[in-house]
């Protein structure tokens, strides 16, 4: 199952140093039956975009609670076995899931991160005009430099 983990630069740096996301369980976002019903579509691309957007909103909340980390949203896309994902949807969060296991780096598919120029807007809570940029896994260490 493709999951979207909300993160920050600090969380991403720790995952890279530790070889993955080791402090399970995690709140993540995914294409769920509840998300399908809420959006009324079976378009996988649209559903994945919505799940990633929900993770980006959660990343912004994490940033608000972590003023010492760079003000750039981070969403990590990963493939995990269905058996480690539990439903955690709510009316206001139809894509939310709970990941009950560690997510090793080998399961990470990509990361989606705000451009550095977006940081002032992100810090001020104005994220709606900023799309996340896609980064391949081999680019992640350079992203943090």
Protein language model regions, located:
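Short, low-complexity, polar/charged sequence segments that are solvent-exposed and flexible
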Residues: 22-26, 48, 94-98
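Generic structural hydrophobic/aromatic packing signal, biased to beta-strands
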Residues: 28, 55, 74-78
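Long, hydrophobic N-terminal alpha-helical segment
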Residues: 1-44
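Glycine-rich, aromatic-bearing surface loops/beta-hairpins
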Residues: 67-74, 78-145
